[in-house]
Amino acid sequence: MTPLLFGSAEAPLYGVHHPPQATPQNSGVVVCYPFGQEYMRAHRACRQLSLLLAKKGFHVLRFDYTGTGNSSGDAEDTTITQWKANVGQAIYELKELSDVSSVSLIGLRLGAVFASLASLDRSDVDRLVVWDPVVSGEDYIAALQREIAAERPSTYGPPSGNRELPDGALHYNGFVMPGSLRRSVAGLRLDAQVPTSVGRILQLVSHEDATFARLRDAWRTHPAFRYQFTPAPHDWNFVDNFGGILLPQPAIQGIVAWMAQETP
């Protein structure tokens, strides 16, 4: 496991490369994180997923988008277009590190959207995994707004700071989504376009949801699409006083099993 900086010298991205721990596959994996508190909750799960895939012989790269985590940049200046481009930069870096001929993209929540968008313009993405994906950006934003509006003052500690600002920025669970980013996220629709250039697709969901079903119905026209319902913990945006993480083993194991099975 090797931390690294990649991309341009002016705006480097932070990533972690997991080299294969078994006979190397001729395919690498880029893991695309979710955003905000979901990133914090999912960090350990994505790390474990990367370690398990490395044990199956995959080169794996997980990374932080511009303006998030340990990457350079300011969240105020980030855009969906930039984060989609970051996925492309991660693909390039992984291919340089490993000399693999193709890549697989695994995205969780909003990361699933960025992975899918990045795959549309490429011919080297062999597999795409969308895990509990955000299907409608508008619904995603509305859910955050409901959580903010429903919050009650804390009895046991200081106020959380969750609020919606006049410019549209959302402050939720310690993270800020600037108004410009919120507006671009609201326009996202994962079911609007089938990623036809991808060789194989797995939609893995840990709970039943009408938007998941809508995506399944839109993407099932792909000849190598698989929908998998694997019950697992899925409250990605929950936060408690102990900084709880989410480690949904059934979902992680399901993705690893599919990746291993689908390897040529």
Question: Could you describe each region identified by the protein language model?
Answer:
Residues 1-27:
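N-terminal cap/lid segment of alpha/beta-hydrolase-fold proteins
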Residues 5, 15-16, 54, 61-63, ...:
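Terminal, non-globular segments
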Residues 19-64:
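Short, surface-exposed "cap/lid" segments of acyl-processing enzymes
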Residues 36, 65-70, 135:
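Alpha/beta-hydrolase active-site loop signature
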Residues 68-102:
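Catalytic nucleophile-loop/oxyanion-hole region of alpha/beta-hydrolase
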Residues 106-115, 132:
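Gly/Ala-rich beta-loop-alpha elbow adjacent to hydrolase catalytic centers
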Residues 117-121:
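Active-site signature of alpha/beta-hydrolase-fold catalytic machinery across serine-
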Residues 122-261:
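The alpha/beta-hydrolase serine catalytic core
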